[in-house]
Amino acid sequence: MTINLQTIATEHRNENTMNLDQMSSLEIITEMNREDALIASAIQPHLPNIAKVIEYCIEVILQGGRIIYMGAGTSGRLGVLDAAECPPTFGVSADLVVGLIAGGEGAFIKAREGSEDSVELGKQDLIQIGLNERDIVIGLAASGRTPYVLGGLSYAQELGCHTAAISNTYHSKIGEVAEIAVDVPVGAEVLTGSTRLKSGTAEKMILNMISTATMVGLGKAYQNLMVDVMQTNEKLRNRAENIVMEATGVERSVARATIDTAKGSCKVAITMILANCSYEDAVMRLQEACGHVREAIMEK
């Protein structure tokens, strides 16, 4: 199938950078900075739809499902990146948020551009991870028409999964297939067609919103503190102590000792201190509160 790139919004030329090859380094990055400043305002009108995606993500996880990101090239890498950040930040299992990139894991490091053109590959990748109706599939494609993503979303729809599409063009094809469309045109790129720039930045901002707000909704934060952070190195152990100190006002020695008693859990340690209860009682309170510290520390 022949594609007319001139009809794709992400392939349009930017009138402000027609002489890009004649600009100084400072002029180039000044123009890039000016263009980047437009991204947040381009996303703003789409916040209600992004919020709907987040509500679906929370619902899916509470029912035992997973969040599946899928995309090709930059879009795929961004999905993999966001998924990879969830376990250390929120203490969730590595298979709760999954990132799929056309061409497999090797494509994260070395581009495999041809793989994005296969509708069947999108379906097969979802079959391989055992996609079921409890999951949500979020397809990402700056152009809004990547066959790999279209194939995955169509298959997910057939199974009865919740689906969402994130693109950077008007009335995207992936948005037509998905339950919720988040089509955020950000205008022509500084370097024509290089969607790793503004389009990629917009996608990253949206993914940040989805994963962060979903995890907060699941009780992974108390106030604005990461209470389920994994302590895999000295920096994170120190952060865990700081989190308990900030949440409760205790000294570092008390925070450290309570975290040890809480078997490494910031969330349990905070509940123990603020509810003045034992480890066992704190665990029970959190279970009853579905992991939300604010509810767990309320007087019974």
Give the location of each predicted region.
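Helix N-cap / loop-to-helix initiation motif
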Residues: 46, 132, 145, 250-251, ...
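A short, well-structured juxtamembrane/interface segment
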Residues: 45-60
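Cofactor-/ligand-binding subdomain signature composed of acidic, glycine-rich
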Residues: 1-42, 46
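Glycine-rich phosphate-binding loops that contact phosphosugars or nucleotide phosphates
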Residues: 68-206, 212-218
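Short, amphipathic alpha-helical interaction segments embedded in low-complexity terminal/linker regions
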Residues: 214-300
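Gly-rich Lys/Arg/Thr-decorated short loops/hinges at beta-loop-alpha junctions or inter-strand turns
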Residues: 31-39, 99-110, 263
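Active-site pocket-shaping loop/turn-to-helix segments
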Residues: 41, 48, 111, 232-233
